[in-house]
Every structure is written in C-alpha cells, then in structure tokens.
C-alpha cells in the first residue's frame, strides 16, 4: 500500500511483496544540465533528446533563457536550442535563480565570469544559499574573476562582474566534477590554457561534451589533469541523454532487498566515472547483469537486469567515492539490509549537499531500527537487523527521500515519510513508478 497526501506532503508506504517489470530511467541530470548550457553557448542549433524534466534542469533552462538563449519548451522528446555564441550572453534584467541546483549555480559562475562588460546577480533557494561556493569562487578569482557575496563571496546570493580571465593550473583539494567543470567553462573564454588536476578522477561528462561541441580539450588520466585552451568555437550538436545511473541505483537496491523481485532498467548511462555504485553492489552480492551494451553520443549505456539477492557488507572509500557520491544514501540502505558491517569513509562532501546526507541517513535509518555509527567523513552500518516502519523525514533532499522510500519497501510495517515531493527535483516519476510496481493505489 502506498498513499500520498499532496496537501501535507506525507507518503505512507508498506512493505513490498515483489517488484517486477521494466522501468525507463529518466535522463541523466548531469548530462541534461551540460547539454542545456553548452547548447546555449554554441553557435547554431542544438537538439536534446531524453532531457531530464526535473526541477533542476528547469532552473538551468530558465537561467539561460534570461541570458538570451532561445530554448524551446522542455520535453523528453526533443528540446531545441538556438545558442548565442560563447561570449555573447546578454545581461539579464533580473536576478538569475538556480533554485535548488548546485550544478546550475556553480557551473554558471564559470560561464558568467568571462562575459566581459556585463553584470550578473545569482541566487538559489534556502538550501542552495547555505551551500559552499568558495570552492569555485576562489579559483575563479585566481583567473581574474570579480565575484562578491555573503561570507566573502562564499555563499549565494552572489554578484558577478564579467571581465577578462587568464588560464591557471588549479590543483583541486577535492575530486569534484562541479569544480572542474566550472573552471573548464571559464577557461573557454580565458587567455591561454586552463588546467585542473584532481586527487581522484571525477565524472567526465563535461570533457566528453565539450569535445563534442568543438572545444580544445586534453585529458591526462595518469596525472588526473584536464586542460582546455581558450578561444574555442562551440558549434551546436545533437545530444542524446542516457538514463541516469544515480536514479537507477534506487531500483537496483530496491530489487536487491525485496524478495522475489526482478526488474529490467532500460537505457542506463554506464560512463565508467559514474558506475561505482554498480561495482559496489555487485561486490555486495547483488545479482545485476548488463545487457545490450552500446555507445550513444560518446556515452556508454546499456540495460540493467537486477534480481533479488542476499547482500553482504563491504568497505566504500578512497577513489571509489567520486564515482558514487550521489548514490551513498541508497547504498546506506543496502548496507542496512546486508549481512555484516559496511564502512563508508572519505565522503565528507555529503555534509554540504542539499542536506547533510551523512547525518540525515544516520538519523532516519536509526529511527527504522538500523545500527548506524556516524564518522566525520562517513558511516558504519551493522546490517542484517530487520528494519521496522517509522516516521521519517526527507530533510527536503530528493536523494534522502527516495532512499527512505526504498528502505520502507523492505521494512516490517508501515513507514510515514514527510517531505516526499522533493523527489521530483531529479526523478519526477519516481513515486508513480513505485506505485505501479507495487500495484498500490495512489491517494491524494
């Protein structure tokens, strides 16, 4: 049984008896953002198929429309963009609002910094205004950017005076695709070469897409360094967005923990910088098979067939973390149902996401009966202890909300989840799909 009150935003879930069928995974959020941005910066027309229709990409589209790009109505079939050219964004008449999207705000700062002679003000919702922006503002300032805001320019709202930039070699203290992508985008309009070296490889969607649009990009996997040469001309492209493996991960865990389940997840992006969760779940004993492996628009994808399985604990740390950072909340759910102990370390980044995801998962899984110890940079979860239904909260974080829905499917008794609607940020159809798979009537 699954009931949802839209008036109070409370979702009530009961244990599932088996999940069977097929699921089409929504478009990859990271790729959707980048396609909208590069299409807006390119000359000519860009078409995007399979765009994620969540709230975050809508925020990106709204910002770039305000900056002068001609973007058609968003849909998953085909979005058309008539770009303005790399350095030709217009000065908007109002504040640019990134909503809840850290990707929108951080990457946009890199783009706006080099728009010489124009002034921009950017902000976001309450959650985004509390998230750290210094990690991109500091290196942008080293390139010559003029950015001001609260707490020394480390918190939104922020003001940007576009100007001339110079390439730098930035050694990032953390493996962050957002930091890397922000600086590469700034480097498109900078004098000389901009290089970013990371301690571990982060997701590489920006590099792949920038190259496809015509940017002069070099990647050195051995030194974990990416370089872009300023002055490139971007040309509109056809972009096919694969399914988001971060969204697929909820179903991979749900099927693994609910007995007598089998799902086929179609057209899932399998970029090797994003498949850490897949590898970890297989190490834990999950029954996951990759079918119909192929490549589309420079991105590998395939179908995933997953069946119920007995899971065992493992260690998740080190260079694995950047490849599964968004999936850690639902991997914590898998750990609670696995035999033995699972240790998650090197994930302090999760404390400054839409919520403090480490604290949120420790708190909410504990309410359901899990034994969870919290570290400054991770969690230790003693699995194999049956979870029970409880009142839990999403912390207004889409990934926490969906992770707790998955946990409820395998728990004993009913679970009441407050703040379920935020799942729409990255997966608008998650609750309706869950309703279909559990054959539950949805009541508002």
Swiss-Prot record:
One of its GO terms (molecular function) is 3-phosphoshikimate 1-carboxyvinyltransferase activity. Its EC number is 2.5.1.19. 3-phosphoshikimate binds at residues 29-30, 34, 176, 178, 326, 353. It is found in: Cytoplasm. The active site is at 326 (proton acceptor). GO terms for cellular component: cytoplasm. One of its GO terms (biological process) is aromatic amino acid family biosynthetic process. Belongs to the EPSP synthase family. Monomer. This is 3-phosphoshikimate 1-carboxyvinyltransferase. The gene is aroA.
